[in-house]
Structure formats: C-alpha cells, structure tokens
Swiss-Prot record:
GO biological process: methylation
Pfam families xrefs: Dimerisation, Methyltransf_2
Enzyme Commission designation: 2.1.1.117
PROSITE patterns hit by this protein: SAM_OMT_II (PS51683)
Species the sequence originates in: Coptis japonica (Japanese goldthread)
Keywords tagged on the record: Methyltransferase, S-adenosyl-L-methionine, Transferase
Name this polypeptide is given: (S)-scoulerine 9-O-methyltransferase
Catalysis: reaction(s): (S)-scoulerine + S-adenosyl-L-methionine = (S)-tetrahydrocolumbamine + S-adenosyl-L-homocysteine + H(+)
Amino acid sequence: MCTSLSELKCPVFSTKRKLLLEFALRTSVDMAAQEGVNYLSGLGLSRLICLPMALRAAIELNVFEIISQAGPDAQLSPSDIVAKIPTKNPSAAISLDRILRMLGASSILSVSTTKSGRVYGLNEESRCLVASEDKVSVVPMLLFTSDKAVVESFYNIKDVVLEEGVIPFDRTHGMDFFQYAGKEERVNKSFNQAMGAGSTIAFDEVFKVYKGFDNLKELVDVGGGIGTSLSNIVAKHPHIRGINFELPHVIGDAPDYPGVEHVPGDMFEGVPNAQNILLKWVLHDWDDDRSIKILKNCWKALPENGTVIVIEFVLPQVLGNNAESFNALTPDLLMMALNPGGKERTTIEFDGLAKAAGFAETKFFPISQGLHVMEFHKINC
C-alpha cells in the first residue's frame, strides 16, 4: 500500500507540503512579524483541512477534466465549468468559484481576472490530475487517502502514542483495513484503483533505471493487487510468465492481462513456488515480525539461486526538507493509521529484515525521490 508514488512524475505531490503551508501562512506571517503576534499565523494552520477538501470536491465535480477537454490552454469561468456539470442549482457557479479560487491561490490552478470575472486553467500542478492517454493520473491516490474511512482513522492516531499496540483503523472500524476492504466494496475499489495507478506511474520510472527484469523467465507478484504491476512488467518483458498472487476478494476484481495468471491465496500461509518473487509496497504494510514471516515464506518458495525483488520508498538515514524524506514520511504516517505495525524503513532496516528471513545478500537500486528497488538473494551472487 502506498500513496506517495505519484510524486515521481507529478509536482503537485512533491510540493504539496509547501503549498499547504504557504497557503496557511502567506497572508499572515508578515503581519505577525510586524506586530509581534504569533497566534495570527497559527490561524492558517487551523484551516489546513480546507485545501485537500476543496481539491477533492473539484475532482468529484470533474473540474480538471472539464478544463482539459476545452483545450490545452483553455481558461474557463465558473459558469463555463458548471455548464458541463449535471446540476440545476442556480448558485452553482458562485459556489464553485469559491472552491476554485482557493485552488488558484494555492497554485493548483492558474487563475486570471477578466472584465467578466475570474477564469481558471490547468497548470503544471493540475495537469497531473487529468488522465493521460493511458488513463493514468494521481486522482485515484487522492481519492483513496481522503476517503472517509481513511480520514476517520486519523482521529485515533494519538492513541498510538498513548497506548501500546493500538491500530487507529482497527479502533475506528472494529476490524483491520484488509478485512474492511473485503466487506466494503467502495473502499476495496478505491484502494485497488489507487494502487493500480500508482504502480503504472512507478514502473515508468523503475524501467528507466532497473534492468533486473530483462533476464527473468518467471515472476510471482506476492500481494500484487489486481495485477497492474505485473501487467506492466510483462508488457515490457513479454518473455516473463507472470503469476499474480493475492487474496480472493482482490483477485475477484482483477481484469485479465496477457501473460498474467491470477492465483488466490494468503502470503502469511504460504507462497507459490517461483523462480523469482516481487514484493511491491507490501513490507511497509506490516511490522517486522510479519514482514519476516512473509519473507521466510518467499525464501521457502524460491530455488537456491532465487531472488525477491522489493520495491518500496526508503527513509534516508538523515531526514531533510526534500522530496526524498517527504515521500517516505507521508506514507509512514498512513501506515501508522491503517496497518498493524506498518512503517517505512531505511536501507539498514530492510537489510535486517532480509537477513532475519535467511537471505544471504541484499542489493539496493535507487530510482527517484526515495523510491528504491531492492534485491534479496537467497545465496551470495
């Protein structure tokens, strides 16, 4: 599970922290400095929730697609946009303008003022919210992380500090995330779409750097979701036989892909025998003990010269004010809220997991902005 992947190609995510803080503080910091009043700048922080909610509303109203369909340099008024939205509300344009002007002030949309009023267009940030020719955008990740079931979990995140063993999602919903997704079709669909879109964006970058798939004949994707990652790999390397191993309720939503076989199962009980195994955004879902159990099952399923290929964001040893740190820190908090012991890790911590599971050697391949491919080898190469 991951939601930061889109930062590899989309500046709206690589700058989202900057945008939020700038929006909150821009109009008040100078005044606070002049008057010596610190509380005034804090008012902006108290309203940070407004920006992501405005962004979600614009997505649900199809605003970005409407502007895109009007042309690459289109500048539309709220009335122009509302004309494409199924509503009979006479004040819709006024209400929409109030949402869009916040996005404009936050540099998510371009905004200009004409004699008739404000007009809005796409910029470098918001183009990432429009589906590409391959129908890929960062929208599925945004919709998942702002889903009510996910957001409600964060109300209990303080309990992780106050009490040992608390999982905010479980406390909020009475079951773990994957059980909940198995029962709630909306959440299951949203999660699968988010992981699928993120996988496609990720592998565009992975293929530029990592060449480890070139000579593989078989690859089992353990916890592979609806098979998007494996389909991307097999499409690029059609000589690979792909097996997507996932829980039955996830496989039930999986489309058919050329060269990919869907196999239901539970990675905690066992893994299909395989020449090579892929774990993409799986280990960060779990604590060390569960991660080691997954890796031990992979170790058992591999031949003597087999390899587990792991794809994760990696925490830098020294945190900084940069995309590499931010890309790992944001999903780390998401893992804290959703999963039992889930967390992002450093290369040293990943090496420790591999060694604890019996792997003899680890190799690390930095991709971009904190994303890494890792190889866990059963024997020394």
